[in-house]
Amino acid sequence: MVDVSETTERCVVHKRQGQDGGDAAWRGVQKKLRDFYGSAIYDSWLSALVYSGNENGRVVLLVPTRFIKEWILVHYLERILKYWQDESDAVYSVDICVSDGVGVQPQMAEHPDGAVDGPPVVMVGGTYDHLSSPLDPRFTFDNFVVGKPNELAFAAARRVAESSAPIPGSNPLFLYGGVGLGKTHLMHAIAWYILNSSVKRKIAYLSAEKFMYQYVTALRSKDIMLFKEQFRSVDILMVDDVQFISGKDSTQEEFFHTFNALIDQNKQLVISADRSPSDLDGVEDRIKSRLGWGLVADINETTFELRLGILQLKIEKMGVHVPNEVLEFLAKNIKSNIRELEGALNKVVAHSSLVGRSVTIESASGILSDLLRANHRMVTVGMIQKKVAEFFGIKLEDMYSARRLRALARPRQVAMYLAKRLTQKSLPDIGKSFGGRDHATVIHAVKQIEKFMEDDAKLADDINLLIRMLR
C-alpha cells in the first residue's frame, strides 16, 4: 500500500543538478502506464506528469494543479511506484508535487487520437474543462458483472455505447435503482467505450448537482448563453442522480430546455436516478414525462449469485486469494449494495495482509461485525405498516380496519406481502397484526400482489422502492 499522505517539506521541489539517469527510466514508466491504462486515460491524466528528479530513491514528479495531483494520488500512484521500481531497484517512493511552472495540460480527450472537429468544449475523463466530471477507470463494461437484476440495464447501456446515433425507443436511456447497484458504473462504461472507439462524439457526463452548480454559476457570471451553447453542442449528455434537481425550479426549467434541444438535434441522453421517472417527487410532470419517452431500465437488488460473481471478479482483478467459502459468506450476508460488498472485501483483504494471516469466515465475521449487524437490521411488521401507509398516503389505522375500499385494500395487501417477504413472522402472526385477519387472507394478499406485479410495472417499482427504504 502506498502512503499518499505527504508533508509540505516532502513536496518541496529541488532543482535537478545534471542528469541523474532517471529520464530513461521515466520514459519506460510512461510507456508501461500508457500500455496498461490505454491512451484515453493516459492522455487525460498521466500525460500531465513531468519528471523532476530522483533524490536518494525518492522520485519527484510535477503536475500543474492540486486537483490533478490528488486524482493521481488516489487512482494511479501505486502503479506508478511499481513501474518505477521495475525500472530502478533504488526507488522507494514517488512524490507528486504541484508546480505552477510546469505548464503542462493533458490533451483534450474527446477521442483517443486527439482529432476533433472544431473547438473542444467537453472532455471525457477529466475536469480541466468546467463541464464534465472525472470518469473512474475501473468502471468499464468488462468489469461489470451481469445477472438477472441488471441484465436489461447492461444490454441497453452497451447498445447505446455501440451505436453511432440514438436508437429509436432508447432515447433517453433512463437507468434507475438503489444506491450502489451499478448505475454510475454503467454510465462511466458508456463514456469509456465511446472514448476508445473510432467514432468521434463529444460527451458530457456529470451529476445533476454539478449541472445545477454550473447553471447557477453561469447566471451569476452572466454567461448563461455560453452555458446553453456548451451543453447543447454535445453529442451525448449523461446526467447522474437526476432526482437532485427536485424542487429546483429554475434548474428544472433549464434542464427541460436542454433536454428538448438535444432531442430535437437527434442527440443521445442517458439519465440515472434512484427511482423511476414517475416516482420523482418534486420534479415537474413535463420532465418526468420526457424522461420516460425512451427506454426505462431498472437495476434491482442483487441476488446471491450476482454478489458472488462480483466478489470473484474483484479478487481476480486484485490478484489475491480468498477462500470461496469466505466469498460465499460475504455474498450471503452483505445484501445492501455492491459498494458495501466491495468495501467489505477490501477491508478483509487489507486486514489479512497486515496481520499476515489467511482469511477465514471467523476472521471476516470479526472484522466486519458492525457492517454485518447493519445488514441484518430487523424489519418489523409495524415498520412495514407505517412505511406503506406513508407511501400510499393513508392512515396507519387503515392497516387494521375492516374497510375494503380499494384505495385502502391495495396498500394493506402490499404491506402483507412485504411482511411475508421481509420478516420471519408466520402467516397467522402477520394476519393478527392486520386487525386479526386469518392466514388465508394473508396468502390471498401475497398471491394478488405477486400477480399484479407481473402486469403492473408501476406497482412493481413502488414495491422495490419500499423494500430499499425498509432495508
UniProtKB/Swiss-Prot annotation:
Keywords: ATP-binding, Cytoplasm, DNA replication, DNA-binding, Lipid-binding, Nucleotide-binding. Residues 134-352 are annotated as: Domain III, AAA+ region. This is Chromosomal replication initiator protein DnaA. Belongs to the DnaA family. Residues 1-91 are annotated as: Domain I, interacts with DnaA modulators. Residues 353-471 are annotated as: Domain IV, binds dsDNA. Residues 91-133 are annotated as: Domain II. One of its GO terms (molecular function) is lipid binding. ATP binds at residues 180, 182-184. Domain I is involved in oligomerization and binding regulators, domain II is flexibile and of varying length in different bacteria, domain III forms the AAA+ region, while domain IV binds dsDNA. SUPFAM superfamilies: P-loop containing nucleoside triphosphate hydrolases, TrpR-like. InterPro entries: AAA+_ATPase, Chromosome_initiator_DnaA, Chromosome_initiator_DnaA-like, Chromosome_initiator_DnaA_CS, DnaA_C, DnaA_dom, DnaA_N_dom, DnaA_N_sf. Plays an essential role in the initiation and regulation of chromosomal replication. ATP-DnaA binds to the origin of replication (oriC) to initiate formation of the DNA replication initiation complex once per cell cycle. Binds the DnaA box (a 9 base pair repeat at the origin) and separates the double-stranded (ds)DNA. Forms a right-handed helical filament on oriC DNA; dsDNA binds to the exterior of the filament while single-stranded (ss)DNA is stabiized in the filament's interior. It comes from Anaplasma marginale (strain St. Maries). GO terms for cellular component: cytoplasm; plasma membrane.
